[in-house]
């Protein structure tokens, strides 16, 4: 049985299998053909962190696959009142067929998976956001930006940065990360990525100059400067991230046909300018929709692997 906790747990071939499955299911969906790959199966969706895209895409996704989505906030279950994660895992996994968790610490997610009898999907943690990267890569394919691309990430060294590190190092493309000093990605995750990069031929570059990162890039991406739980740091972060906004001047350094991606929600005037966001709105909202399709591919792939075990 396999879980989907972080992309470092998968080979290049497995990641591409899930992507191809997502593309196939998306094509069926666009033809209004809803194949019940997960008929009568239940996806438990546990949310310790609130979300728009994660809840909507998983709930609609499992429904379109013929299953049922069960939304559980931390206030709906005993987890929010101190029940150990391992006990919640034992109960939920005996009743449901798959579990998606959106939480804070990666260690919580991994503890749940260790005691679960069914596949567990990472809907987001402080350390990683792998389902978003699957949607991003699906979008890159659709825009013709998946053949040895140069991807530039500008901003905070957060869970999105960590997930880009995993994707690039597994698939073998070039990733440039520009962060302010003091906001670099986790060195342990960087170390993992560098090790994977040696095997895949990926090029990983960390720097503090956004202009150097974006130069001739095929894909430019960023994320919020102030993640959930960092609200008290807002003023300091705005000051520290000066010069790291993806605006028209910075974007002009990328290739003329470069695309811009953002996992949303976007805070215009901070990490991205209004002009850049609206100029690339089609890509951004295709990316948001692709959460639905990428996650369906992941769920079906995991369900099949469970059936094989």
Swiss-Prot record:
Keyword Amino-acid biosynthesis: yes
Pfam entry (one): OTCace
Keywords: Amino-acid biosynthesis, Arginine biosynthesis, Cytoplasm, Transferase
A Gene Ontology biological process term: citrulline biosynthetic process
Known EC number: 2.1.3.3
Any one GO molecular function term: ornithine carbamoyltransferase activity
Gene3D superfamilies membership: Aspartate/ornithine carbamoyltransferase
Family named by the database record: Belongs to the aspartate/ornithine carbamoyltransferase superfamily. OTCase family.
Protein name: Ornithine carbamoyltransferase
Organism this protein belongs to: Nitratiruptor sp. (strain SB155-2)
Gene: argF
